[in-house]
Amino acid sequence: MSQREGSLEDHQTDSSISFLPHLEAKIRQTHNLARLLTKYAEQLLEEYVQQQGEPFGLPGFSPPRLPLAGLSGPAPSHAGLPVSERLRQDAAALSVLPALLDAVRRRQAELNPRAPRLLRSLEDAARQVRALGAAVETVLAALGAAARGPGPEPVTVATLFTANSTAGIFSAKVLGFHVCGLYGEWVSRTEGDLGQLVPGGVA
């Protein structure tokens, strides 16, 4: 990733003729990563639900919405924003998700220690979404639309699960469910937003 970023900066200082094809390649690469993570996110949510026991997975069950500090799903107005602003919002959300996914993994290690596959999937998801966030920020910088400031402190976000642990096991499972769901929503939204920058992409 760092080598790719360095190459972008080198091409940008050389000339727009050599820079644009390289930027297009970076956008395609990042879009492909987002598309792959969208599929992984669907699998992660299914796997998470399978490991939580009833009532998770039962027909008609809809977990209550619990607040998550520093992160919510894409707003309805997101699609009407300029692409650069959408990508800024994507990058901000992606920067928060690794800490949340790590917190879910730690809680699941306590609740489901015999679910190593789920724990590995959560660990992989945190690492992969961190890579996607860095790639989106690289694209933004190359477009001259860098992300605006840092996201919430990871420690503050992670303590959400500690603070809610006193509310019981069910609440912890619901929080994990929503984190996995938000992970899927944001990587899917990122895929769609990047797709509008890919030549021949669909809006």
From Swiss-Prot:
InterPro entries: 4_helix_cytokine-like_core, PRF/CT. Transmembrane segments: none annotated. GO terms for cellular component: extracellular space. It is found in: Secreted. Gene3D superfamilies: 1.20.1250.10. Highly expressed in heart, skeletal muscle, liver, lung and kidney. Lower levels in testis and brain. No expression in spleen. One of its GO terms (molecular function) is cytokine activity. Its main location: secreted. The keyword Secreted applies. GO terms for biological process: neuron development. Keywords: Cytokine, Secreted. Induces cardiac myocyte hypertrophy in vitro. Binds to and activates the ILST/gp130 receptor. Belongs to the IL-6 superfamily. This is Cardiotrophin-1.
